[in-house]
């Protein structure tokens, strides 16, 4: 099998799935490896705009509560939507929030966001190669101040995706 054939098989085999073993943890070393792999995505002008924050265990609940608080502060969604948000990050054993450093130049900002999307694809392909299930979602708010702080992101950063990771169920 050629490298191209192996890559084609990997890319075609990647699926979006939240069917995961809820109690089987994803090791922090694996999450770190996936984030490092993600950082090999191309970025024009070497801006390296991606930001990663991972949540496991009780951290997922903190993420949900913090996002729901930001939603309430922004008067976004009703109580039912905020309540749903509080628990949604418990759907997978690991959650990676992926942020993007903005750029004042609109064209460079768009290029940065594209680079972060490419980084997420690298992360998803790496997860598939390791046998993990994955799901890329977009949060209700892309600039939630308390979530950005929880993630140790800059207040100006934007969230491009939330990636759920777990072992297939």
What are these language model-derived features?
Residues 1-91:
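N-terminal amphipathic, basic helical "cap/leader" segment at the start of enzyme domains
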Residues 75, 151-169:
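A glycine-rich helix N-cap at a beta->alpha junction
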Residues 95-99:
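Active-site-flanking beta-strand signature of metal-NTP-handling nucleotidyl enzymes
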Residues 15, 100-102:
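Short, histidine-centered active-site or binding-site loop motifs used for metal coordination
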Residues 57-62, 68-69, 102-104, 145, ...:
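Short, charged/polar surface micro-motifs in flexible loops or helix N-caps
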Residues 91-94, 132, 155-159:
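Short coil/turn connectors at secondary-structure junctions
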Residues 38, 102-150:
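Small-aliphatic-rich amphipathic alpha-helix that forms the alpha element of a beta-alpha
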């Amino acid at each position: 099998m050629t490298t191209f054939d192996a890559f084609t098989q990997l890319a075609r085999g990647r699926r979006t799935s939240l069917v995961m073993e809820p109690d089987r943890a994803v090791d922090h070393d694996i999450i770190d490896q996936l984030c490092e792999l993600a950082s090999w995505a191309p970025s024009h002008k070497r801006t390296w705009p991606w930001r990663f924050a991972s949540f496991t265990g009780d951290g997922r609940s903190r993420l949900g509560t913090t996002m729901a608080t930001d939603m309430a502060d922004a008067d976004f969604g009703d109580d039912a939507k905020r309540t749903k948000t509080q628990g949604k990050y418990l759907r997978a054993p690991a959650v990676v929030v992926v942020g993007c450093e903005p750029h004042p130049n609109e064209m460079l900002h768009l290029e940065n966001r594209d680079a972060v999307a490419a980084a997420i694809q690298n992360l998803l392909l790496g997860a598939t190669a390791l046998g993990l299930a994955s799901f890329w979602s977009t949060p209700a708010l892309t600039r939630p101040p308390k979530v950005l702080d929880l993630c140790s992101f800059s207040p100006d950063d934007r969230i491009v995706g939330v990636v759920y990771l777990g072992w297939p169920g």
